[in-house]
Amino acid sequence: MTIKRIFMVLVVLFISVWASSGGAAQSLTLILDWFPNVDHLPIYVARHQGFFAEEELEIKIISPSATSDALKLAASGHVDIAISYQPQTIIAAARGLEMVVFGRLIEHPLTTLLFLEGQGIETPKDLEGKRIGYTVPGLMDVLLDAFAKLNNIQHYKAINVGFSIVQSLTAGKVDAVMGPFKTYETVVMDHRGYKVGYFELEKWGIPDYDELIFITGKNTMNKYQATMAAFRRVIDRAIAHVRQNPENALKDYFEQVPEADRRTETDAFKLTLPYYATRQRLDVKRWQQFANFALKYGLIDKRVDVASIIWTVDQ
């Protein structure tokens, strides 16, 4: 065989190998913070519109068994990406969990302290001596403690209600719950005929923060930086698409999540739309301000340098 012929054979083999490997999508498992709802709509829209596929990503979306599962599973590398909360990641970082925050889904607080109207609750001080539920252990109970300190609530009983927000309130098991979103559980309660009130945390002393964020384990990030950068690009693109085409985006969501309650999710989407992240890059200064607040009010017991957990690369 001549040298020229050998060269041509090698070229053909190289092209064949390149073609067979280049089309393989990177498979990622994403765990939600909660059951699927319109907070997560841009992710489902991205999948429906083929935005992930265009970046050669294949996303498997799963729901947590318990409200505190997502962060731990991502930090340990058992899933690739988790949706978490800014306060939760700062608390976890102070406790030594290794993770990287690399994107945002909801850029301002949605969390409230929710209660039924007609219970004599007008100001936070009226919660003195009450039974207050919380949704996410290790997060909402800690935020509740800070809220109580800020608003001079000296005595209350904290009760873990997990996912059972509506049932706990309507059955009288608790007088209020820390953790419901002003864009979602308020809608659910209204549709079930209950009038509710709520305290927005940022209006009662808690600093502004990113409600829903994307995190991954430190080892996962070290291995898949380009993949995570691609994921961020997709989320940015999906949110822009949702803002420009809200009605079609909602239709895409219902096709992806056919079991969703259409009435509730439609009304909740209208309230949620303004809160989707305007960009993926995280504000280190804003994050540090919250971390400093967390140390001052006992959410954490040692200082966290947020630059050590935030991925600020623009890609």
Residue ranges, per PLM feature:
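Bacterial N-terminal signal peptides that target proteins for export
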Residues: 1-8
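Bacterial N-terminal signal peptides
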Residues: 8-18
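Sec/Tat signal peptide C-region and signal peptidase I cleavage site
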Residues: 18-25
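Short, glycine-/small- and polar/acidic-enriched structural segments
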Residues: 27-162, 166-171, 175-183, 198, ...
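A bilobed periplasmic-binding-protein/Venus flytrap-type ligand-binding module shared by bacterial periplasmic
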Residues: 45, 111-121, 210-227, 275
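Pocket-lining segment of extracytoplasmic ligand-binding domains
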Residues: 87, 163-256
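Secondary-structure end/capping motifs
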Residues: 222-299
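Conserved C-terminal helix/tail region of periplasmic/extracytoplasmic solute-binding proteins
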Residues: 292-315
